[in-house]
């Protein structure tokens, strides 16, 4: 028996029909990542499994305090994520974004997803990680885009050859046109001369000359037709890194219209000129044509049947400024609801190096081979791209699960619902689930080149387990959206961040963990820090701005976590004042330990 969500059509079991020992053995500590999320199973015939290559053993992975549901990812994708995390000590959401962006890029031009509501959707993903520059996203990206870069290099070499061949063909055609026009003029002169001299005697010659002229003119018409139909060969480039949105659109129009934008510096994209660029990105996410009419012919272009995957990273301070300037615009026109956003913490202090431990590459190589195979399967003729696409659909139980989840989310957006502030994301929630489910299914089970039939339900029908997995993943991205756009959740997160910084400063001032208030009466100087020093320590969420910082500490004061002490004259007549400060509140436990009374400081919400 094999889990629908964790198997692939291109080799996922051992030669004897069983799953890899490390992944499906009775040892629960190793099997958890593969088995505990299994919702349904299918029989895999022993004959079929004998034809499949042996799969690598599955890596053991036990991340600390990880909220992302990485166990829900299908086998090959999950294993690639784990290898990246173990090799380079990156946060799970960073590895997931790198891997899923490569999956989206590889599959987006090959499939549709039919959600059962009368329309098909493209399957491209937009993903954005808000994290520090030390998050190693570029390293994670490079691990899984090596196959894409190799594909681009191959296509660039082919393009150079095609350009040279096209130049030769154009020159040859133009040379033929010149020669034929010269011949046509000569025949016309001869016909005219013969007609003037003695048309009756030269009748047969004139007829032959006219026939020859007609033949030449037909050749010229055909060459002119070929000239009018000639198009410069398109470069099948699929990977971009640093390019403005308008130039990206133009490149999609002039080169290949299915591509990916992978950038570690997304500030230029987020700070685009405004609603126009964001609206274009919205259309590209939906696979809609874009018609741009510029001031000149060079500035005018048309993108037909586009596909775009985006994997972006931006620093927290840049993202916070973007939210302040354009957050409501991006949310209102739907850009942010189309993005799968994550704000992972960089695991500082845990990214140690141990060269005695070999790097894990088996699953990553398997993943990259699959990406390369999918990219190579795309049609090289732009006019025939859409003909080879397969439409995936939900099984009956999967359709019911998707609809049930969709309706529950929709009801939660009512005025009294729990997702009022997340309405924009919920508007796209069902489509996010469908896209991820389709990518999970096709990447693991999709067949290439003559290996599938029109009625092959195993390939086209997405099982319930895969939809349930996609729901778990999208639920996590919904929680990340809440962290940014739900005022209560955002305030709570900012408050926890301020409390964390306050605790760090107090521990520094007390040469270790703050254990008890010191001082007489209510004056406990070891429990407070200067207001503006704490504000200067808070670099995230735009909290260095006094107005925003004050809003958060006032919220904490109202909850009883801190007290705000205004400037206070400490020495009468000396004119020396203690600056405005923030003091942590505390509660006595009412008992003693080791000759010291115990206290609980209110660093938690």
What are the roles of these predicted feature ranges?
Residues 2-4, 10, 20-605:
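Phosphate-handling catalytic cores of nucleic-acid transaction enzymes
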């Amino acid at each position: 028996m094999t889990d629908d969500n964790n198997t692939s059509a291109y080799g996922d079991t051992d030669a004897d029909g069983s799953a890899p020992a490390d992944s499906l053995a009775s040892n629960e500590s190793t099997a958890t990542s593969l088995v505990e999320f299994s919702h349904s199973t299918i029989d895999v015939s022993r004959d079929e499994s004998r034809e499949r290559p042996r799969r690598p053993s599955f890596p053991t992975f036990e991340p600390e305090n990880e909220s992302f549901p990485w166990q829900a990812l299908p086998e090959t994708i999950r294993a690639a994520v784990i290898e990246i995390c173990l090799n380079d000590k990156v946060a799970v959401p960073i590895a997931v974004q790198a891997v899923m962006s490569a999956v989206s890029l590889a599959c987006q031009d090959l499939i549709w997803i039919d959600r059962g509501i009368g329309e098909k959707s493209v399957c491209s993903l937009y993903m954005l990680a808000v994290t520090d520059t030390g998050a190693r996203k570029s390293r994670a990206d490079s691990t899984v885009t090596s196959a894409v870069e190799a594909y681009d290099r191959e296509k660039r070499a082919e393009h150079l050859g095609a350009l040279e061949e096209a130049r030769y063909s154009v020159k040859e055609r133009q040379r033929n046109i010149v020669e034929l026009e010269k011949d046509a003029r000569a025949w016309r002169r001869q016909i005219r001369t013969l007609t003037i001299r003695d048309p009756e005697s030269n009748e047969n010659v004139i007829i032959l000359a006219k026939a020859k002229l007609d033949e030449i003119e037909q050749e010229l018409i055909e060459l002119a037709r070929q000239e009018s139909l000639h198009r410069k060969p398109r470069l099948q480039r699929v990977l971009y890194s640093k390019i403005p949105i308008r130039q990206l659109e133009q490149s999609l129009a002039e080169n290949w219209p299915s591509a990916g934008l992978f950038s570690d510096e997304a500030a230029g994209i987020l700070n685009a000129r405004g609603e126009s660029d964001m609206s274009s990105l919205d259309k590209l996410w939906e696979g809609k044509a874009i018609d741009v009419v510029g001031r000149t012919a060079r500035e005018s272009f048309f993108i037909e049947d586009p596909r775009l995957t985006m994997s972006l990273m931006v620093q927290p301070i840049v993202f916070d400024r973007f939210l302040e300037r354009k957050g409501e615009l991006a949310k209102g026109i739907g850009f942010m609801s189309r993005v799968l956003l994550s704000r992972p913490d960089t695991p500082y202090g845990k990214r140690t190096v141990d060269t005695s431990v070999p790097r894990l590459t088996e699953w990553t190589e398997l993943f990259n081979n699959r990406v390369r195979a999918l990219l190579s399967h795309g049609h090289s003729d732009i006019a025939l791209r859409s003909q080879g696409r397969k439409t995936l659909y939900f099984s009956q139980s999967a359709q019911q699960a998707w609809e049930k989840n969709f309706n529950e989310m929709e009801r939660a957006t009512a005025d009294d619902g729990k997702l009022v502030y997340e309405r924009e994301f919920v508007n796209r929630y069902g489509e996010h689930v469908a896209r991820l489910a389709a990518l999970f299914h096709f990447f693991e089970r999709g067949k290439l080149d003559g290996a599938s039939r029109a009625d092959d339900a195993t390939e086209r029908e997405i099982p319930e387990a895969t939809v349930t997995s996609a729901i778990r993943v999208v639920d996590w991205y919904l929680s990340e959206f809440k962290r940014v756009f739900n005022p209560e959740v955002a305030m709570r997160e900012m408050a926890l961040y301020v409390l964390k910084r306050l605790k760090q400063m107090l521990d520094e001032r007390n040469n270790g963990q703050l254990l008890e208030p010191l001082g007489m009466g209510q004056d406990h100087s070891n429990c407070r820090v200067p207001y503006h020093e704490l504000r200067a320590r808070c670099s995230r969420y735009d909290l260095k701005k006094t107005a925003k910082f004050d809003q958060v500490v006032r919220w904490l004061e109202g909850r009883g976590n801190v007290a705000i002490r205004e400037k206070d004259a400490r020495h009468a007549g000396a004119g020396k004042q203690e600056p405005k400060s923030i003091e942590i509140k505390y509660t006595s436990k009412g008992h003693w330990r080791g000759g010291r009374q115990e206290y609980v400081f209110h660093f938690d919400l």
